[in-house]
Amino acid sequence: MESLASLYKNHIATLQERTRDALARFKLDALLIHSGELFNVFLDDHPYPFKVNPQFKAWVPVTQVPNCWLLVDGVNKPKLWFYLPVDYWHNVEPLPNSFWTEDVEVIALPKADGIGSLLPAARGNIGYIGPVPERALQLGIEASNINPKGVIDYLHYYRSFKTEYELACMREAQKMAVNGHRAAEEAFRSGMSEFDINIAYLTATGHRDTDVPYSNIVALNEHAAVLHYTKLDHQAPEEMRSFLLDAGAEYNGYAADLTRTWSAKSDNDYAQLVKDVNDEQLALIATMKAGVSYVDYHIQFHQRIAKLLRKHQIITDMSEEAMVENDLTGPFMPHGIGHPLGLQVHDVAGFMQDDSGTHLAAPAKYPYLRCTRILQPGMVLTIEPGIYFIESLLAPWREGQFSKHFNWQKIEALKPFGGIRIEDNVVIHENSVENMTRDLKLA
């Protein structure tokens, strides 16, 4: 494999080209990109965990250091002021010396408020991208040039097309997450609580709770019916029935986002349903290709859900077509088939149809779908179908003309298992689709 250093060199060249184009289009001289700042908890002197500006970590794999600044103009070597205070209270990261520092000019910034004297004197035509607009105003940036929508839309649109460096980082994040999923399954099989399973996951991935790209969803039994369950019970349930794990990892700022579901027993209806959802997920991925709308794949999976509901006699005496047409599949899969993935877990530009930011909303029937793009080479997306047994979504169907088609006895028997979700991360190539997750043999 080509070295990360050479891939990064090409990555920077791509970002420089995008920056030149954006600056020319919006008549700016340069962009000042801020890593961000620490913010204290209200009425406290303790800060919230630091989360870096994603537009900053697109350029440099510096994810844990606030008060850093990048100046980029698309022509000259990017200039990074790296926060390096004299501080005996807190850990201070050393000045970087890594595979990427040949391609960026790295300068120590000993005081957070010292950046003003180091920037070009003429700042009226510099754009600021960052989370602290008041800091930009203090530096003399024009208010109209603070997080300018046109520039951000342009950069966001092209972030959809990953460079080879970005794909290499995402494959490394996959490896970490796969290690975590294997450790978590083992912890589940040994009877651990959600809290302890989460610890096993973090240990295997080498992450802290604040390092993972999103809060791990570690859901035993009926908790799997809560789509974003993050409570983490300390006590294991008396009976282990099911385990849904939605958990990722991060490498150089790039995310993995995987989900697996396991049945405690291999010989019940739920275990067969898990297997069937997994098979249908793989079958859908096998059909994916560039040039097709992501929305089409979402709709196609509702047809596959209908097939499973019929096979398992959860819905009876109704055709699969009628199930989808009348949205009987909706309460069983209330979320979208997936989303773009990259520097952010729910990566940007899922609805953008061009580099001017033209927005195409999700279909009214499927409002929680997070992407309406035509798939193109370089895109990375999740494919994460599920079937759930959520009473608040099923309740409206207990009355009315379609109620008789629901096998309520079967649904009640499956509700204690919560639900099922299977999620892989795929890369769209010109003539193929790469499944980064399955390539690592995660069943």
Swiss-Prot record:
State the InterPro entries in the record. Creatin/AminoP/Spt16_N, Creatinase/aminopeptidase-like, PepQ_N, Pept_M24, Peptidase_M24B_aminopep-P_CS, X-Pro_dipept-like, X_Pro_dipept
Q: Which UniProt keywords apply?
A: Dipeptidase, Hydrolase, Manganese, Metal-binding, Metalloprotease, Protease
> Which cofactors is this protein said to need?
Mn(2+)
The cofactor binding remark recorded in the entry reads:
Binds 2 manganese ions per subunit.
Domain of life the protein comes from: Bacteria
* Family matches, as CDD domains: Prolidase (cd01087)
Annotated Mn(2+) 2 binding lies at D246, D257, E423
Q: List the Pfam families.
A: PepQ_N (PF21216), Peptidase_M24 (PF00557)
An example GO CC term for this entry is: cytosol
E.C. no: 3.4.13.9
Q: Which GO terms describe its biological process?
A: proteolysis
The enzyme's main class, written as a single word, is hydrolase
Asked if the record carries the keyword Hydrolase, the reply is yes
**Any idea which positions bind Mn(2+) 1?**
D257, H339, E384, E423
Query: Does the keyword field hold Manganese?
Result: yes
Catalysis: reaction(s) = Xaa-L-Pro dipeptide + H2O = an L-alpha-amino acid + L-proline
In its UniProt record, a GO molecular function of this protein is:
metalloexopeptidase activity
Q: Which family does it belong to?
A: Belongs to the peptidase M24B family. Bacterial-type prolidase subfamily.
Q: According to its UniProt entry, what is the function of this protein?
A: Splits dipeptides with a prolyl residue in the C-terminal position.
Entries under PANTHER family matching the protein? XAA-PRO AMINOPEPTIDASE 3 (PTHR43226), XAA-PRO DIPEPTIDASE (PTHR43226:SF8)
Name the record gives this protein: Xaa-Pro dipeptidase
What organism, scientifically named, is this protein from?
A: Escherichia coli O7:K1 (strain IAI39 / ExPEC)
